[in-house]
Amino acid sequence: MXKKNFIPSVSLVRRDLPTLVTTTTSSTALSKPTSSVVSETSSKSLPSLTSSAFSTSSGXTSSSSLIVASITPPSTVGNPFILNAADKPNGTVYIAVGAVIGAIFISILIWWLVSXYLSRRFTMTNSYANDSKNLYRGHHKHSSSLQSNPFDINDEKSYMQDDWDSMSQLESSQYEDAASPFNPIQDPFTDNRRSLFISPTLQVSQYEKSHSRHQSKDTNIFIDDPSLYVGTYLEEEEEEERKLNLNRPQRAASPERKEKKINSMEGYHKRNQSSLGLIPVASATSNTSSPKKAHKRQAPSMFLDDVLNGREII
């Protein structure tokens, strides 16, 4: 229904201006004319305002209908280009992505475990092989059992426990012998030093005493096989040669420096960085045989060495 706005129509009635009427009267009684003006005013009432309103017009109703077609997806039956998701659960894409990520993490974890196991096994095999070669060189039965089954530690605990104490003592003695005897930090007698004089001969003699003490300790160690010693035949020869040289120490260098002809003593003094052994052994024996003559020709350092060793009295 359409409604219209009704505007009232106003009709204006036109009117004329009022007329002015003038009347003149004359009188003869006074012989004087008198005029009186009578004004007559005619007035009209105001026009009436009439309003007329049109009646409301009847609205016409019209009805229209719109036809909408329903959209239906194509059927998946027999269509290879459309995925049939009717029989699949919700969130299939998320499940597939999570499965792929989980498979990647599981493969990384398996690879790490396998690599750690293989590296540990390789390390244990090498360590047991080296131990069997170094510590059990003479024991063929023990080394064969270790090499055949390197992870069977329980069978070898009894053998290793018996020899472990002796091997630890042997290694400690080797480390003590390997220490430099001429290092003042390692020498315990330097703490009680009363003078600033340093005598190489005194240090050699003190090292000889300590070495003999360690050697007596080493002889008490029970070793059933000489092959347990770590070292070769050349190292044993050098050790014996060093013992012989320490048993007869040479005197300090005199002003007449002569080259030594013995190659073994030369190598020994080069290793220890000392100036001993530059004079032949015969001069040392001659000095010990005739102390009075040697006293006239020996250097002041040699005289102080003799005083410290008790061979000379001031």
Curated annotation (Swiss-Prot):
Subcellular localization, as worded in the UniProt entry: Vacuole membrane
Membrane topology per record: Single-pass membrane protein
Parts of the chain that traverse the membrane: 93-113
GO cellular component, one term: vacuolar membrane
Span list, region Disordered: 32-59, 240-309
InterPro entries registered for this protein in UniProt: PRM
Keywords: Membrane, Phosphoprotein, Transmembrane, Transmembrane helix, Vacuole
Composition skew (Basic and acidic residues), residue ranges: 254-269
Disulfide bond entries: none
Keyword Iron-sulfur tagged: no
Modified residues (Phosphoserine): S148, S254, S274
Family: Belongs to the PRM5 family.
Protein name: Vacuolar membrane protein FOSTERSO_4058
Source organism phylogeny: Eukaryota, Fungi, Dikarya, Ascomycota, Saccharomycotina
